[in-house]
Amino acid sequence: HSVDSSKKAIELTDKNIELNKSFFPKQSEHASFAIDTFDFLETAANKYDVIILDPPAFAKHQNVKHNAVQGYKRLNAEAFKKIKAGGILFTFSCSQVVDTNLFNSTVMAAAIIAKRKVHVLHYLNQPQDHAPSIFHPEGAYLKGLVLYVE
């Protein structure tokens, strides 16, 4: 399944899947949903082998950092509830006010809420072609985790 709140993003996803259908032998099993991801995860009956969470920035300013952390925690907790044992979760943040340590702690809190055992397979950050300046540490805002969920 592909889920995005943007109908345009879903239309582009469907178009790309059609263009690349030779790489998707079970294309008929794919479904796209233009819906809020929180709503989808809370109501979805399926359990998934792989989930990729790549939301837009939840916070661009310090005054909304707490709300962003709560959003990341809720989103990841719902994903942990919907992933099969042995599944892989890719989770990302591009909120510059939520640093890597806070993001990792928030994802850990989500795993605790969902009562799932989780192992970090990879810590991810922005590639070298998007390197931040040493004089602007806030430029290091892209972060992610690849997690194995028991």
Which stretches of residues belong to each language-model region?
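Helix-to-beta-strand junctions that scaffold the AdoMet/dcAdoMet cofactor pocket
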Residues: 83-85
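Flexible loop/turn segments at secondary-structure boundaries
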Residues: 8-10, 39-41, 59-61, 97-100, ...
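Mobile active-site "lid"/loop adjacent to the S-adenosyl-L-methionine
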Residues: 48-78
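C-terminal catalytic and target-recognition region of SAM-dependent MTase-like enzymes
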Residues: 88-150
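Conserved SAM-binding motif I beta-strand of class I
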Residues: 1-4
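Generic hydrophobic alpha-helical scaffold/packing signal
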Residues: 10, 14, 18, 38-45, ...
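S-adenosyl-L-methionine
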Residues: 6-52
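Short beta->alpha junction loops/turns
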Residues: 6, 37, 68, 95-96
